[in-house]
Amino acid sequence: MSNQVKIFDTTLRDGEQALAASLSMKEKLQIALALERLGVDIIEAGFPVSSPGDFRSVRSIAQEVKNATVCGLSRALEKDIDACGEALSVADNFRIHTFIATSDIHVANKLRKSQDEVVEMAVNAIKHAGRYTDDIEFSCEDAGRTPIDYLCRMVESAINAGATTVNIPDTVGYTTPTEFGGIIQNLFNRVPNIDKATISVHCHNDLGLAVANSLVAVEYGARQIECTINGIGERAGNCSLEEIAMILQTRQAMLGLNTNIRSHEISRTSKLVSQLCNMPVQSNKAIVGANAFSHSSGIHQDGVLKAQNTYEIMTPESVGINKNNLNLTSRSGRHVIKHRLEELGYKAEDYDLDTLYASFVKLADKKGQVFDYDLEALLFFDKQKPADEHYKLLYLQASSGKEIIPSATVKLQVGEEEIIESCTGNGPVDAAYKAIIKVLGHEQLEIVDFKLDSKGEGADALAQVSVIVEYNGRRFNGIGLATDIVESGVKALIHVLNNTHLADQIDHQKKQQTQTAGV
């Protein structure tokens, strides 16, 4: 049996299901390219049949990703599989992942079919997927609660039908490592054709056992792990990619297993997903948390200074955390910024140096010193700006204080027109938002969520505002970054407005295409 474990990342599919607002196509592509750079073997890009937006995102990722297999999810239905086949057809390498529930609970209450009928549906779906590709994955949804005899029968039938990967999900995170390891062991002992397919696992974290169950599965012969960056996902999340990858790397001598993950890319991939998904990483999170390599105990600090491995089983550098907190100032030149970004793991093609440097100088003039976390925040935010901004902030003034009615004046460029409005509110941000809504001339926007995070340390740290807005029945996410909280909040709302404008343009184009096709 091979000692190579494939890493199947489902951040863009299962992970996105945990978000309050969907990622934009541009954001999904950013994450996909980061996963490719990380060394992920298979990227599950989405569920193409679920919406036109998801279809376009999967197709865009399929076109751009060259060094990983791009995968689309489908139910065991022909229309789902056809949508996958069409969306993925532009990829160099692609996989169709189809699934059906197999536990008694699901078969009886959700599918309302007999076990024989479910097997037939699975076989037909796999054969239909074979019209598009030889790389077919089949999942037995809720395998963790499926009777072992029926699970063995389903796996054997799926492989005979043409599935090259069979996935065994612990869909509700119910099993313990002993139970889940026993399921995998039983499959290898009882399914006669199991050597003709890769056995995969997809573990949820409802009882905090997703990583442990994934680990025991590969010890019993599974050779693909489905996981997500930062462990994000439905309910309590999924197996954390960074945790399982570093377990296999750190304990390689004992486990004898390898992956293609480039561990030095873990930290920045984690940061990117955290930023784009608006899901902060807990400080004590293994591998990527802010405290993962911190030592406060005097005894521990003394030990680490004498020999790093006294209290560190891996180095921060091994996951891409650089300890050099070089302080940059407005006197630092472009070459210094470029060099520092190279040390942080960013390549020249990851950013526009002129644009980034202009933002850096403005920030340095305000703060005096700019730190690594500031620089990375600027790089991230500059990437989020649309190439063609329909809405631009030209002027902002806000006032508030004790015994003062909060007010704000905002001047926006809307297309070719400049509009200025003033409003009062319950606070300076509320006043600024009301002024912007007056500029728009309508009240179709509903603020669903407003979140403020500090990016850095001290009172002069950058403020990042993430705002979720409901517009025409859809949710849009925006991010703003500034040393001033009100400015950051306004930038976040303008980011949303540009996203809604782009969505309106796409909807208009689709209507025109439909009308043209009907003529």
Curated annotation (Swiss-Prot):
- What pathway, per the record? Amino-acid biosynthesis; L-leucine biosynthesis; L-leucine from 3-methyl-2-oxobutanoate: step 1/4
Q: Where is the signal peptide?
A: none
Q: Name one GO biological process term.
A: L-leucine biosynthetic process
The prosthetic group or cofactor this protein requires is: Mn(2+)
Q: Does the keyword Membrane apply?
A: no
Q: What class of enzyme is it?
A: transferase
Question: Might you report a single GO cellular component term?
Answer: cytosol
Q: Which GO terms describe its molecular function?
A: 2-isopropylmalate synthase activity; acetyl-CoA C-acetyltransferase activity; manganese ion binding
Positions of the Pyruvate carboxyltransferase domain: 5-267
**Which InterPro entries does the entry link to?**
2-IPM_HCS-like, 2-isopropylmalate_synth_dimer, AIPM/Hcit_synth_CS, Aldolase_TIM, LeuA/HCS_post-cat, LeuA_allosteric_dom_sf, LeuA_bact_synth, PYR_CT
Catalysed transformations (reactions):
3-methyl-2-oxobutanoate + acetyl-CoA + H2O = (2S)-2-isopropylmalate + CoA + H(+)
- What keywords would UniProt list here? Amino-acid biosynthesis, Branched-chain amino acid biosynthesis, Cytoplasm, Leucine biosynthesis, Manganese, Metal-binding, Transferase
* EC code: 2.3.3.13
Functional note: Catalyzes the condensation of the acetyl group of acetyl-CoA with 3-methyl-2-oxobutanoate (2-ketoisovalerate) to form 3-carboxy-3-hydroxy-4-methylpentanoate (2-isopropylmalate).
NCBIfam families in alphabetical order: leuA_bact, PRK00915.1-1, PRK00915.1-3
| Oligomer status and interactors | Homodimer.
Q: What is this protein called?
A: 2-isopropylmalate synthase
Q: Which organism is it from?
A: Pseudoalteromonas atlantica (strain T6c / ATCC BAA-1087)
Specify the taxonomic lineage.
Answer: Bacteria, Pseudomonadati, Pseudomonadota, Gammaproteobacteria, Alteromonadales
